[in-house]
Amino acid sequence: MLKKSVKIGESELSIEVGRLAKQADGSVVVRYGDTMLLVTAVSAREKKDIDFLPLTVEYQEKLYSAGRIPGSYFKREGRLTEKETLASRLVDRSCRPLFPEGYAYETQIIASVISSDPENEGDIHGITGASAALWVSDIPFDGPIAGIRVGRVGGQLVANPTAKQREQSDLDLVMAVSRKAIVMVEGGAEEVSEADMVAALDFGFTTAQPALDLQDELRRELNKQVRSFEKPAAVDEGLRAKVRELAMDGIKAGYGIKEKGARYEALGKTKKEALAKLKEQLGDGYTPLVEKHAKAVVEDLKYEHMREMTVNGGRIGDRGHDVVRSITCEVGVLPRTHGSAVFTRGETQALVVTTLGTSDDEQRLEMLGGMAFKRFMLHYNFPPFSVNETKPLRGPGRREVGHGALAERALRNMVPKSESFPYTVRLVSDILESNGSSSMASVCGGTLALMDAGVPLKAPVAGIAMGLVKEGDKIAILSDILGDEDHLGDMDFKVCGTSKGITSIQMDIKITGLTTEIMSRALEQARQGRLHILGEMLKTLAESRKEISQYAPRITTIQIRPEFIKNVIGPGGKVIKDIIARTGAAINIEDSGRVDIASANGEAVKAAIAMIQALTREAEIGKIYTGTVRKIAEFGAFVELFPGTDGLIHISELSDKRVKSVSDVLNEGDEVLVKVVSIDKTGKIRLSRKEAMAERAAQQGAAAGEAAAQPAPAPTQPDAKA
């Protein structure tokens, strides 16, 4: 067994090899604080006949790691949660680019959280563990890499912040770094500037380097030899030259077409004609392998031409590198929804709809630390018709979950807190057309749909997808990339934010040598594009509507004293159920005494509030009330002023005359006028009937005197005709 440790942030990171899961090709236990992950890597020995890497990553949180039993009927973990899916994507995006080209062997990485420290999240250590498991195995992998989280508390950057620090942080970045470069970035922020974001990236890159040293030390001591594997047969240079001659002119012409459908049709026709001519030229020499290589060459030529065109100032449709496609926005397009918008940018279109609900509609999440509740959700859907394809409709895939999370993170901090806006908010983004940047269209459409619904956003948010291509000393930064440009770049990144700063960012960086200056330039160009998009959006709707939809529930919040909660709920919930049944309003009561009353009918809300206030009224000294006698005693009578609130009338306070027996004046069930004389520290209320009667008599006497003092009305004049 080997174990290496180093301190990163406030805790020690250790990687252990050779104790658990020894039959896997690579297996490590990563520990940070009391959080531990078992990460394994296994790669098949038999190659698949495919042209991509068949990599599967599964990040799973075992509930036993936090001493909990699953709450499901079967009492065991089920399918991956959204959180686990997102963590799996982080590991996948970090590791996938580092496998050798042409490696077509089925590979699986499983990262299992086996001990959970509530102060230290496991996702970033899944990245480090996956790299370590691959690095100590014989699987070909161009590592190592390490995961790190960067926060900012009180203006100071923090590595791997604790849960408490994350609550105070205005930045939450997850990064994967290698020796030479940042590989992957995913994170959210509270309107952080571009300069501060670059500083955070630099900090994370430097701070994570010791985790790479650990992995290198383990690899050296284990001295594992990397396995050999069958590489794809090299393409004959003569064949490459023939295909270039047959296809290159058509490829150049195709990429000059602006419209996506026509461009794809032209490029498809070029490929088909080139293969037909090649078959005619080669005759019997045109084998299935030759055809496969020829098709690969066509794709290589498309990639080559696109990059060459880009670094030399060109672009599909002759668009400038910093030019955003034409934008149209519509709001209020669906009359019965609470808020809706259609955002169209070029050939990408999103229909985004807002639904407002009560706290009962919050999403319940079973987490390692217990149950959690989520009041803002964004769900992203990518139907096949959006790209003119036919596929069966299934549940959301990992890509849809990831895109939805990116857009949700962009908007989350701009949605007001429940104290000022007590609604659960669900956004649904249905992509109707797609030609790049659909997740960013969801952000822009989401902002408009929220504003249309009357959600008082702190600031509107827009998003833009960017690309960066570097060939030698030539650098091209592309704003608002198309689908064809998405995979061509050396850095693909998406930036969302307000006019003030960044709220969400996602980067995948494929090369080394990107300096701070280049990244600053790229983020500045993204900022300019974002501001342009915001300007176009605000032409349609400049601010949130003042009123929510007539079809949305009206939620009114009142505060009662916590000790009165039992009065409102009643035995077995009898009282609150009766209020709900009689008014039709939804009612939620929190332990703090906060009460949310919701209904689309304003009168129902008023009625429910009146009933709750009647149950939670407090007696005030000096005020007169009509109460009900509940109990007679020798020394006085107990009177219920309102439900749950009783007071005592001492026998001496029943009348201004001497009373021998309380029952001579009052009986149980009688209604009686009383005045609150005092309330002691324990809440006991002393009442007086005689003071109430005297005060009421004085008021009536004063009113009678005022009436007598009024001048008599003038006599009616007799009719002139009489």
Swiss-Prot record:
The keyword Transcription does not apply. Residues 696-722 are annotated as: Disordered. Residues 622-690 form the S1 motif domain. It catalyses: RNA(n+1) + phosphate = RNA(n) + a ribonucleoside 5'-diphosphate. Its cofactor is Mg(2+). SUPFAM superfamilies: Eukaryotic type KH-domain (KH-domain type I), Nucleic acid-binding proteins, Polynucleotide phosphorylase/guanosine pentaphosphate synthase (PNPase/GPSI), domain 3, Ribonuclease PH domain 2-like, Ribosomal protein S5 domain 2-like. PROSITE patterns: KH_TYPE_1, S1. It is an enzyme of class 2 (transferase). Keywords: Cytoplasm, Magnesium, Metal-binding, Nucleotidyltransferase, RNA-binding, Transferase. Mg(2+) binds at D486, D492. It is found in: Cytoplasm. The keyword Magnesium applies. This is Polyribonucleotide nucleotidyltransferase. It comes from Myxococcus xanthus (strain DK1622). The gene is pnp.
